[in-house]
Structures are given as structure tokens and as C-alpha cells.
Amino acid sequence: MWTMGYNEGGADSFNGGRKLRPLIPRLTSCPTAAVNTNSDHRFNMAVVTMTAEQNKRELMMLNSEPQHPPVMVSSRWNPTPDQLRVLEELYRQGTRTPSADHIQQITAQLRRYGKIEGKNVFYWFQNHKARERQKRRRQMETGHEETVLSTASLVSNHGFDKKDPPGYKVEQVKNWICSVGCDTQPEKPSRDYHLEEPANIRVEHNARCGGDERRSFLGINTTWQMMQLPPSFYSSSHHHHQRNLILNSPTVSSNMSNSNNAVSASKDTVTVSPVFLRTREATNTETCHRNGDDNKDQEQHEDCSNGELDHQEQTLELFPLRKEGFCSDGEKDKNISGIHCFYEFLPLKN
């Protein structure tokens, strides 16, 4: 900044007698000031140089020395082998929960072997008791499981021996073949562990075969005997057994079919006419009365034996019954069974 000043001499009219001068006064240059400036500069340079050298030395020291991680100081107790040996010996002697004074004594004794505090001794006894309880419980559970497994194995082996004994491992084939009049279909093989079942089946099977055989034989015998009897016995026999024949109609039908089958199987054809029966009525009256009782018993036995077999099919009566040639005049209204009727069919004449 410059200011205008007044020139008293007035020599310069162009400037109007005025001139510019600075607001801040100029510093006068002196040799002492230059010396001071040079000395400060030298001091600063020396400080910078020393600092740089110190930094270099520190870097060199860091590079030359190995780097170690910082050591972390832990507050956890690390027992020494001697301390553990003393504590385990005290535990074996019976010390489980020591008192405060006893803990202080143990701590003072163990400080000779390393760093330790009273709380470390207390927690060591507590943890040792807990570990011993867990170990005992684990042993008990393992022993119980072994006992259960052994018991289960014994039970399973015993049950297997009872289920499949060596004496009963016999595979029996029930292949019984019956005689005349029985089914010849063999039974399926089956494994039997009981000896009573095949005997019962065999008895039932033989009973059925015997019943069929007896029925066929009785049917043939009865048919032949009834063919030789007079007509008067037919009506009396029918009157005596009318109720049984009505009540047991399926049995009568089955007997009819059995007797007819037996007669056809024997291939004997017998033809009896009504005239022949009338002529024999007078001569065989006493024989009829004498044989009547035997025939009644035989027919009753036949009805009883045939009544037990209900599996036979019923047969239909294909032809009506004839009563004129077989009954007397007083007994024409009575029904006559179809087992005593025989027909002879002759060829028709053209």
C-alpha cells in the first residue's frame, strides 16, 4: 500500500508536489540479522539430521531382532504334576470338602511347587467329586444295559428252543388214501409241532371213510332184502317209519341215491312184477313177521348212520309213486316210500 505525501519544495508540478510512500516501514538490513538467520537454519538442519539417523537405527534394530508375539498373562491356574500328586493323595485319604482353614494349609503347602490360590484348591476338590459321580453313574448304566441284553438273549434263546425243539422238527405229509367210497385226494403237506393233531385228523378221516363204506354196503343189503319181502310188510314198515322219513327227508333222498348207485354199480338188474308179489303174500306171511323186527332194527341203524352225513346232495323224485300193486284195500290212502318201487321199461310197439 502506498500513501500520497506532500512535497514542500514544489519542484515537481506534474506530481503536484506529492509522492507515494509505503504504509509498512522498511526494515533496515544489518549484518547481525543475517548472522542470526544463518545460525537458526543450521540448527534446524542438525535436528532433522539427528532425527533421521535415529529412525534409521531403530529400523535396523527392528529388522535385526526376531519378532516374538506378545505374551498374554492368563489368570487360569495351571497345576504342576507335584501339585496334582499332593491333591490326589489327599483325596484318596478321604478329603472331599475341606474347610477354609484346611484349604489355606493345603494352599501354603502347594505354593512350594508353583503358583496356586485357595480358590483353586476348593474348585479342584469340587470338580474331582463331580467327575467321580459321573464315572460311577456311567458304570451303573453300562452294567444295567449289559444285564438287560444278557437277559433278553437268554429269553430269546429259551423261546427259540421251546418253539422249535429238535424232536418236533419233522415234516409230515398227510397223504392218506381211503378205500372204496372215499375221497382219494391227498392232503397238503404241513409242519406239525404237536403230535395230537395228526391223530385227530386221521381218526376223523377214517371215520368218514368208514361211514361212506358202511352206507354203501347197507344200501345194497337193504335193497336186496326189501325186494324179497311181501307187499304187506311194505305198508306196515312205511307206517312205522313215516315220521322219521318225513323229518329226515334229505337223509332218505341221500339213501335212495346211495342205494340206486349201489345197485347200478353191481350191474344186477332185477325186475319184480306186482303179480309176483301178490302170490308170495300168502306164503311168506310168517316170514315177514319174523324178519320184520330185524329189518326195523337194521333200517333204524341205517337211518342213524346216514343222519350224521349232511354233506351229500339231495336227489329229486323223477317219477310218481304207484300204490295199487303194493298196498291192500284198507291202506290205499297211505303214502309209500319210493325206495320199494321198481319199474321195467319195455320198448314201444310200432
Curated annotation (Swiss-Prot):
Residues 72-136 bind DNA. PROSITE patterns: HOMEOBOX_2 (PS50071). It holds the Pfam family Homeodomain. This is WUSCHEL-related homeobox 1. The gene is WOX1. Residues 283-308 are annotated as: Disordered. GO terms for molecular function: DNA binding; DNA-binding transcription factor activity. InterPro entries: HD, Homeodomain-like_sf, WUSCHEL-like. The keyword DNA repair does not apply. It comes from the Eukaryota. It is found in: Nucleus. Signal peptide: none annotated. Its main location: nucleus. Transcription factor which may be involved in developmental processes. Keywords: Developmental protein, DNA-binding, Homeobox, Nucleus, Transcription, Transcription regulation. GO terms for cellular component: nucleus. SUPFAM superfamilies: Homeodomain-like. Belongs to the WUS homeobox family. It comes from Arabidopsis thaliana (Mouse-ear cress). GO terms for biological process: plant organ development.
